[in-house]
Amino acid sequence: RVLFRSTDDVDDYGLPPHSIEAVVYGGLDSDIAQIIYKELGAGIQTTGQKVVEVITASGATKAIHFNRPHPVPVYVKVVGLSTSGDFPHDGVDQLRAAIVAYIGDNESGGVSIGETLYHQRLPAVLYKVPGVLDFDVLIGTDAENLQADNIPVDSRSKVVTDDGMVTIDA
């Protein structure tokens, strides 16, 4: 996700005039900095907490700034799972893997930076596992306060989960 400011004043997010802020999920810092440098227009500054030095075409070094998204942990609980005979022996593991793949973990994939996690989209993910008939799914950023509700995030954040944050009560 790239936030940019083309005017002469600071915006509501604190972006300085004539600057970009790349919020990047995944990848190596050095690769990210090289890509930003290659695509950066003249006179545009970069902002962010990560700073990587790149070598310019003239042999000079230039500091490239960018940010990683703020991780928003998501806990998921599937309750009342009802299945048919088509449900595979490793179906619970498949459900857990499907949830992690859809939301994304700390390394890759899932819902985009700045995108709300919509509760109503999760059932479609779970019904892809053969033999799933019915269930309820609850989500939240606190394991003790799960709800059937959306999880909004700001433009510099990303929802993440992992196997240990997904509970399936069959």
Spans of features found by a protein language model:
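Carbohydrate-recognition loop of C-type lectin domains
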Residues: R1-E115, D169-A170
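An aromatic-glycine-centered, glycine-rich loop/turn in mixed alpha/beta architecture
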Residues: N67, F87-A170
